[in-house]
Structure formats: structure tokens, C-alpha cells
């Protein structure tokens, strides 16, 4: 009787294992957006913890400190904690904070492998809301970051590094209703349009019917976050109905 050669099977199994992150030293950082708080991201944090992930619901002074400074603080913290692998879940401006962190990483230094990055409604190409308030009398009261999120091609948001990891993008839409936000010509969540959220290197993009500020609290959004973190994919349907 001819014996089966298991060497090819063992080889491919070894390659598969080597390409998986070391989840014993994998940490997921969760970041709120401009004016947000730990409470806003608490359900996502608890959902990931329930699935066995080591997480940190990371907060920062979004009204007082500029994005570059916050990104540097995050970089220093992650480097000091020295996990093998890190992932991110961000809402709104939190995505820009993580993108700014990339500026401080160089190939010669030891820095954890960045595995997955799930963005909820990120103003990757700015937001018309920032355009409006950047030119208003309220600008001085809103802190340094509003003007950094303008939509013009020379703005700060446009110049940030593009993530090199697996990116999953969740964008909020409400339909093209002029009464929803008169400042925005395209489909939007009240703050960020789909067009301004997209970077172009996403592994997957999915839309949900949600207002901007409520997105991290939605059960279906949390389900999508958990699914992408575990599998690297959302679901087949491109729109999740409430």
C-alpha cells in the first residue's frame, strides 16, 4: 500500500501559520473622533474584548492638541508597549490620528506589525463641515484640528501617509437629501461624505445607514467591526439596512 506524502501539506500549513499575527501579543487600539469620548467607543471595545482581543479604548484631547502631536503620543506609547502586532479601530478624526502616527515610523526601527485598520466615517479627504467652521468666528473656540480637516487638496488630511495594512472602511449614508446637510452635495452621514472618506487602498468598503455621531453605537456596525477584525472581510451586501 502506497504511503501518502504529508510533506507538501505540512509545508503549506507552516506557511499559513507564519503569516498569521501572534495574537498572544496582539493589541487593538480604539480611537474616538473629534469631540468624542471613551463612552462613544465603549460598545466596540466591549465587543472586541468579548471575542478575546486585548484592547485599549484610547482617548486624547481633540479640542486642545493638534493631530500631529496626538499621533506622536500614540506612536511613542505603541513603541514602548512593544507588542508584536497591533490593529486599529477608529471613528472620524481618529483615523487621521493613526495616519499621522505613520509619519514617525521608519524601516530601520523596531515597531509592531500593523495588521488591520478599521475606519468608521473617516474624513480622509476632509469634510465640508470643517470648511465652513474654518472660516467662521467660532474657529478659535474649536481648537487647532478643524482647519486641518478642510477639503482642499493642500489641506493636512490630504498629505497624511496612506496606511500599508489591511484597511476596512465603513461609511455612513442617509441618501441624497438636501435637508440632511445643505453644505454637502454628495451622499453623507451629516458630517463626512462617502467621496471624502475613501482613500483608494481599502481592502473593502461598506456603507451603513447611520448618522455620523451614532455610528460607533450601532449594533450592526459593531458586528461589521468584529467580522473584519477576525476575517479581513465584511459581508457580501454593500448596504446594511436598519
How would you label these PLM feature ranges?
Residues 161-242:
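C-terminal catalytic-base region of ester-bond hydrolases, centering on the histidine
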Residues 43-53:
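A short, Lys/Arg-enriched amphipathic alpha-helix followed by its capping loop at the start of a domain
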Residues 1-9:
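Bacterial N-terminal signal peptides that target proteins for export
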Residues 20-24:
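Sec/Tat signal peptide C-region and signal peptidase I cleavage site
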Residues 8-17:
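Sec-dependent N-terminal signal peptides
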Residues 26-34, 55-61, 65-164:
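Serine-dependent carboxylesterase/thioesterase catalytic core
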Residues 42, 69-70, 127-133, 178-183, ...:
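Short aromatic-enriched loop/helix-cap "lid" or pocket-rim segments at secondary-structure transitions
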